[in-house]
Amino acid sequence: MSLGRSTAHAPGSEDAIARMWGISARVRVKAFSFAWHALLLFALLVGPTRAEPPLSMQQIAPGEYAHRAHDDIATRANKGDIANVGFIVGTRCVAVIDTGGTLAEGRALRQAVRQITPLPVCYVINTHMHPDHIFGNAAFVDDHPQFVGSVKLAQAEASRAENYLRALNRELGDIAEGSEIIGPTQTVDGSATLDLGDRPLTLRTWQTAHTNNDLTVYDEKSGTLWTGDLLFVRCIPVVDGSVVGWLEDITRIKQMNPRHVVPGHGPLDPPWQQSLEAEEQYLAELAGDVREAIRRGATIQQAVDTVGLDQRDKWLLYEIYHRRNVTAAYAELEWEQ
């Protein structure tokens, strides 16, 4: 029964029924009013207020939990769940690392936290500005955490907020309902330490690479590095910053020598040396081939049409992102001295 739709009656039919059963007009009105409010209450109880089911989580190490997302672009089928997210539990509180692509996913992540621990969420850390990592932030507002990100995060989010929201609503429709950008309340410039209670986390910002606001989280206790999108596994790396800077950052990440790695996209806790080397090889060949195209006097379109064609079968989402990567690399390297 639709509560938003009126129901037609024959003229005088309610009066006739009332007379048949001897019901007074006043009692009849009260009875219909009670039934109406009862139906409204029922609709509210069984309606869209139901809690999101918790995200599935994988324990990477004691106290470290991550969700393996879909290797895809955001669609209604995957509900925008396309970036790995998770949380770290200390003795005092919890740090959430990235929150997913919608408010609904953020709520599901919060439910997953509550399945594991009753401890409060004291930090929500965003590894960078991209929408698949940040739109779940609003699910944690009532926990009153510090929202933590690079010192460059707020400006980067503000510059694209309108476009991100428009694209989210276009691709996901009502699945995206309530999603909004919640910016940082605490920023990191260089490095910072957060303590969850017997669990120090080292946060570090990087030079422009995947974006200009990349941030990693290293858990000293378990040796787990959350790379954000500085590491893509199986999915093609996406250049929204600097291919040169990214290659330099990869060299520094290797020197950290973590025991476990949670990448921004792809399988959790992969053989990280092999994964970084595959990403490094792609980016190095991209930069080298684009430099050669520029040296030959090729236009940007000619470079897009010819560079990196041999990479097609090596990476998921190649057809969507590789040509964009060539364009970004050309624009960066064209003015290289």
Give residue spans per PLM region.
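Active-site HxH/HxHxD metal-binding segment of metal-dependent hydrolases
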Residues: 111-187, 191-193
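Bacterial N-terminal signal peptides
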Residues: 33-46
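Active-site neighborhood of phospho(di)ester-bond hydrolases with catalytic His/Asp-centered motifs
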Residues: 97-99, 122-130, 148-151, 206, ...
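Metallo-beta-lactamase
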Residues: 52-60, 155-206, 211-212, 220-221, ...
